């Protein structure tokens, strides 16, 4: 199979939405019957985002094979059917690490290691490897043209453009075309300068996607085409929209997919965007709304919970309701108690690390349990629910996780020291292990207990979800917690680890050790999120009734 490559760069400012644009183009090409994948090349020195602060970088998206990756890979999976893996995201740090490891082994036979050719060759190998087996590979370059950090990546894709030729490569550049209120017009000069910067390093863009708060007039498109040496039909206007799922249709309406397929000489069917039209219709026509309180510690940056936010919206589509998310700092819950939890239709406690605010999360679980308020716990959200139940129902005073209190009298949650991976291999970690890359990561099979809400949600006796954690339920307390009324509704493939818990006599008190948000899409939803939002809508009706 001959893979074609589309390289996506950004200029003028950061946060233009390269990832959304790349994913939207991929969605159209997939709708034309093509096998598409997307890669993200990140210019930072970290090996991966695994140990980066969520308030700086946003969430860490976990792939099926256990890679800790950039949140843009979540966008990719929500827009196309192709599942991402560790080949779809790599950083400057990872490239340098691998090159230096080869140098230590003597693979370069004593050569002087340089950015060109050794680093650029390593980048090219990663890109070609990631695209193998697909009709089209879209490669997003992180950062902004002009940043010193991005230069090795830009040089690498420049070389690939020469080596693979125009028949197999296309360069798409996102720029900002701002509207100046005082002048009453859009300004194209930033775009011209951005393209000039890109051309100065040897890359001539084939397509310009011009971002702005409004559509770009035809005369301004012609001006951009003239001064940037790009065909006028290849100047695409991408205005701000109220839903990212409208973007595939916007790009298709301007013929971007047709331009790409003709450039590559690919004969394929017309794009059928019916599924996306259905998503947009459901989003625009809810029959009601619910308010979900998300109790977390990284709420100052909503992108820290990006996949959770999107999964709640997807669940709203399947329940025909609009989901309003109220972000609640768990430390505020510690200070003010139930005052900040009143008026909610459901409480969700997402994953997280560290002791700060954990008692607020435990209080939120207690409030939901005692007030029959739908509760959904994810990862740490499951652990705090179990701790709360142990303390206040099972009579285990002082129960806690050893992550937060080493000398707790009842360590109901403890460090996992050994577990089976999906391939059957044993993974191990200890108290002194590195933080990075030492968690239970990736897709794991979960056995669901018959007659539970979990099994009813999935309509199956097993599920496969993705994990990212170091701590688990202490099996020494299972019998006592079960006798107190807690149901262990999901167990690991070897039935040694607790994956899900729930309360049987509660409208919806369900929690999982895994991260179901990573598998939610607008077209398919995710069973637990759909069930949780349905319970929240039912709770609201009971209150109104």
UniProtKB/Swiss-Prot annotation:
Keywords: ATP-binding, Glutamine amidotransferase, Ligase, Magnesium, Metal-binding, Nucleotide-binding, Pyrimidine biosynthesis. It catalyses: UTP + L-glutamine + ATP + H2O = CTP + L-glutamate + ADP + phosphate + 2 H(+); L-glutamine + H2O = L-glutamate + NH4(+); UTP + NH4(+) + ATP = CTP + ADP + phosphate + 2 H(+). The lineage of its organism: Bacteria, Pseudomonadati, Pseudomonadota, Gammaproteobacteria, Alteromonadales. One of its GO terms (molecular function) is metal ion binding. Residues 1-266 are annotated as: Amidoligase domain. L-glutamine binds at residues 352, 380-383, 403, 470. Residues 291-542 form the Glutamine amidotransferase type-1 domain. It comes from Shewanella woodyi (strain ATCC 51908 / MS32). Mg(2+) binds at residues 72, 140. CTP binds at residues 14, 147-149, 187-192, 223. Pfam families: CTP_synth_N, GATase. CTPSs have evolved a hybrid strategy for distinguishing between UTP and CTP. The overlapping regions of the product feedback inhibitory and substrate sites recognize a common feature in both compounds, the triphosphate moiety. To differentiate isosteric substrate and product pyrimidine rings, an additional pocket far from the expected kinase/ligase catalytic site, specifically recognizes the cytosine and ribose portions of the product inhibitor. This is CTP synthase. Pathway: Pyrimidine metabolism; CTP biosynthesis via de novo pathway; CTP from UDP: step 2/2. ATP binds at residues 15-20, 72, 239-241. Allosterically activated by GTP, when glutamine is the substrate; GTP has no effect on the reaction when ammonia is the substrate. The allosteric effector GTP functions by stabilizing the protein conformation that binds the tetrahedral intermediate(s) formed during glutamine hydrolysis. Inhibited by the product CTP, via allosteric rather than competitive inhibition. Its EC number is 6.3.4.2.
């Amino acid at each position: 199979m001959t893979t074609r490559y589309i390289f996506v760069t950004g200029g003028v400012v950061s946060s233009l939405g390269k990832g959304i644009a790349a994913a939207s183009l991929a969605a159209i090409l997939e709708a034309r019957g093509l096998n598409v994948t997307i890669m993200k090349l990140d210019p930072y020195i970290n090996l991966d985002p695994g140990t980066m602060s969520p308030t700086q970088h946003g969430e860490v998206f976990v792939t099926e094979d256990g890679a800790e990756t950039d949140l843009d890979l979540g966008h990719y999976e929500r827009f196309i059917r192709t599942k991402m893996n560790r080949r779809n995201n790599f950083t400057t740090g990872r490239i340098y690490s691998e090159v230096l490891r080869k140098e230590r082994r003597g693979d370069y036979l004593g050569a002087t290691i340089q950015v060109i050719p050794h680093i650029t060759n390593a980048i090219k190998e990663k890109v070609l490897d990631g695209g193998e087996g697909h009709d089209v590979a879209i490669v997003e370059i992180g950062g902004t043209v002009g940043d010193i950090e991005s230069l090795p990546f830009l040089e690498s894709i420049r070389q690939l453009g020469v080596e693979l030729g125009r028949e197999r490569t296309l360069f798409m550049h996102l720029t900002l075309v701002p509207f100046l209120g005082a002048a009453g017009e859009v300004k194209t000069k930033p775009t011209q300068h951005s393209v000039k910067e890109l051309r100065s390093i040897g890359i001539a863009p084939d397509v310009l996607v011009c971002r702005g708060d409004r559509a770009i007039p035809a005369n301004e498109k012609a001006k951009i085409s003239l001064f940037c040496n790009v065909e006028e039909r290849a100047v695409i206007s991408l205005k701000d929209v109220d839903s990212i799922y409208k973007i595939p249709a916007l790009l298709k309406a301007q013929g971007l997919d047709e331009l790409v397929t003709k450039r590559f000489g690919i004969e394929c069917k017309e794009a059928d965007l019916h599924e996306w039209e259905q998503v947009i219709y459901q989003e625009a026509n809810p029959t009601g709304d619910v308010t979900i309180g998300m109790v977390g510690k990284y709420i100052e940056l909503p992108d820290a919970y990006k996949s959770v936010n999107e999964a709640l919206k997807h669940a709203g589509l399947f329940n025909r309701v609009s989901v309003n998310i109220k972000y609640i700092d768990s430390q505020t819950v510690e200070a003010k108690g139930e005052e900040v939890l009143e008026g909610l239709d459901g409480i969700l406690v997402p994953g997280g690390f560290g002791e700060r605010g954990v008692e607020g999360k435990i209080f939120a679980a207690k409030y939901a349990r005692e007030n029959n308020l739908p509760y959904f716990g994810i990862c740490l959200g499951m652990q705090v629910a179990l701790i709360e139940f142990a303390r206040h129902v099972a009579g285990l005073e002082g129960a806690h996780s050893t992550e937060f209190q080493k000398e707790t009298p009842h360590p109901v949650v403890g460090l996992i020291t050994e577990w089976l991976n999906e391939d059957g291999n044993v993974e191990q970690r200890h108290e002194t292990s590195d933080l990075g890359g030492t968690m239970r990561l990736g897709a794991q099979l979960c056995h669901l207990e018959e007659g539970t809400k979990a099994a009813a949600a999935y309509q199956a006796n097993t599920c496969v979800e993705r994990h990212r954690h170091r701590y688990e339920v202490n099996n020494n307390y299972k019998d006592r917690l079960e006798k107190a009324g807690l149901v262990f509704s999901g167990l690991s493939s070897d039935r040694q680890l607790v994956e899900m818990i729930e309360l049987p006599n509660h409208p919806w008190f369900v929690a999982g050790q895994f991260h179901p948000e990573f598998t939610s899409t607008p077209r398919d939803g995710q069973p637990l999120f759909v069930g949780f939002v349905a319970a929240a809508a039912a709770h609201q009706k009971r209150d109104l009734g």
